[in-house]
Amino acid sequence: MRRRAGLIAGALALAALLLGLPRSAPLFHYWFPELDRPLYLQDGFGELLLAHLAIVALSGGAAALLGISAALWTSRPAGRDFRPLLETLLSIAQSFPPVAVLALTVPLIGFGAAPALVALALYSLLPITHAALAGLASVPEDARETARAIGMSARQMLWRVELPLAAPVIVAGVRTAMVINIGTAALASTVGARTLGLPIIVGLSGFNTAYVIQGALPVALLAIVVDQAFQCLEEWLTPQRHA
């Protein structure tokens, strides 16, 4: 109940901020009297929020699909020997900062949202895959034995026993990746993607602190709201809740 209240409060605060920012020119004029244009007006904050969410959701969804699939494969007998290789490759991918990945992908696929999607997806793979591996490993062997005893096939056991029991841990990994991506997606504006990072980048390049604040506040609130939403989902998926 407390997490749900936090989610509602965060969502209301984010909505109030998005509605209030376009009308906050007098406030920022007061705070930054030295600036001729203290309010970012090039793009609507609601539009930037939707574009930001789209990049985060697409990259996170792709990473979740790949990461969970890889974890499932390496947790089966046929792919178990490849787990060390998978973990090594993921650690190498995580060692590259998103800015470096953006710089490498721009010459290959151009400016815009595409390089941001690649960079964020790569950066999300490690926490999601590790969470999926940990979640599958946490499934009690007794549950598997019971499933086999009642005649479940391997596929039925996966969908009806293993994944439901591993779901809270997997969702925790997805939550970590999504929250990180929300902050990191702001960097995508350096390569032409429309995100909430645009006011921040424009403000930094033009020494306009007001723009930086106007971009950073929605990003921070969005991260809090998404974190609370995933915590509520994680709590709902926890088996003890339904006991």
Where are these regions (language model features)?
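N-terminal, non-cleaved signal-anchor transmembrane helix
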Residues: M1-G61, T238-A243
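C-terminal transmembrane helix and the adjacent membrane-cytosol boundary/short C-terminal tail
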Residues: A5-A9, L18-P22, A137, I213-A243
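Loop-to-helix entry region at the N-terminal start of transmembrane alpha-helices
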Residues: G44-S59, V106-P127, A166-A167, Y211, ...
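Faces of alpha-helical transmembrane segments in polytopic inner-membrane proteins
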Residues: L66, L90-P98, V118-L133, A137, ...
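Cytoplasmic-entry segments and transmembrane alpha-helices of multi-pass inner-membrane transporters
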Residues: S69-T105, H130-A137, E145
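Glycine-rich helix-loop "coupling/hinge" segments at transmembrane-helix boundaries
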Residues: P107, T184-V219, T238, A243
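Transmembrane alpha-helices
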Residues: L122, A154-A188, Q214, V219, ...
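Short helix-to-coil transition segments within interhelical loops
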Residues: L136-D142, T146-A166, G192-R194
